[in-house]
């Protein structure tokens, strides 16, 4: 994903799966952002060595390495959401093994170029196996982007609180999953 929006989307998706669909879900942070540590501090008041930690109905796992992934796979989760961070963090082989892949991008003027570049690069390698989603930008910009570059991206509904699933978000997740 592009910077800005990926972690928020991942938390929203994990909460939809765990809180709304009542599935056993976990979010893994496979990037160096440290966002989940900040989330843990804000939501629980502490930052511990505890991995995974829980907020509401979902589990969160910070600073995930290859060994942690193996461990999580043995824990019987219905859904494992992985936040790979920015495409600039380099390619992660684990990404291509996921059942569902989402590229979270932005239609803000200063970010749409890297969104387009990644799409074109992967398309050239014939690796287009993900759904493109957009966090920021108007519907008009999304349509123009789609028309100009033939990249169809669905707009993620705005949600100020990643932990509460609005009706619009519920319908959105139902559509993309």
Where are these regions (language model features)?
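Conserved catalytic-core segment of NTP-binding enzymes
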Residues: 74-168
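Hydrophobic positions on the alpha1 helix immediately C-terminal to the Walker A/P-loop
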Residues: 9, 13
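P-loop/Walker-type NTP enzyme "switch/lid" segment
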Residues: 1-5, 16, 20-90, 95-97, ...
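Histidine-centered active-site loop/cap adjacent to the catalytic His
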Residues: 167-177
């Amino acid at each position: 994903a592009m910077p800005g929006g990926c972690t928020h989307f991942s938390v929203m998706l994990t909460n939809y799966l765990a809180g709304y669909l009542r599935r056993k879900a976990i979010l893994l942070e496979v990037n160096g952002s440290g966002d989940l540590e900040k989330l843990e501090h804000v939501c629980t008041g502490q930052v511990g060595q505890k991995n995974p930690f829980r907020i509401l109905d979902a589990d969160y796992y910070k600073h995930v390495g290859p060994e942690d992934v193996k461990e999580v796979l043995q824990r019987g989760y219905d859904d494992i959401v992985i936040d790979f961070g920015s495409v600039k963090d380099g390619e992660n082989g684990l990404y291509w093994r996921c059942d569902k892949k989402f590229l979270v991008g932005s239609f803000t003027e200063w970010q749409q170029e890297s969104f387009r570049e990644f799409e074109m690069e992967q398309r050239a390698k014939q690796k287009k196996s993900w759904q493109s989603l957009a966090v920021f930008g108007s519907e008009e910009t999304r349509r123009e982007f789609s028309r100009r570059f033939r990249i169809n991206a669905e707009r993620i509904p705005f949600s100020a609180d990643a932990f509460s699933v609005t009706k619009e978000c519920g319908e959105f997740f139902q559509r993309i999953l």
